[in-house]
């Protein structure tokens, strides 16, 4: 999935979010000039890693950048975290947010960009 950033922003934190069927998670930005900026990559998803991750330096994304999220899910018996045996069709119907439902989200904390912000350190 992807979304376009309509204005210059600086990113403070990101929060990847999936449930028990999630296996891999990757988020990155593509600037209007085509440059790719990695945001987060988790090759072995763990449900307990749903934290807000803070960048050491403010990340500037210019207007028109795309934020893209890619994920892999494993709804088989090979997934030791699968809550269902046998596996079932999983949704998040009607806004249900149970751990046994599934979802894919990227929460981004950001503020409008001001020149010089990229020199601030968040550590």
Regions inferred by a protein language model and the residue ranges of each:
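His-enriched metal-coordination microenvironments in redox/metal-binding proteins
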Residues: 1-119, 123
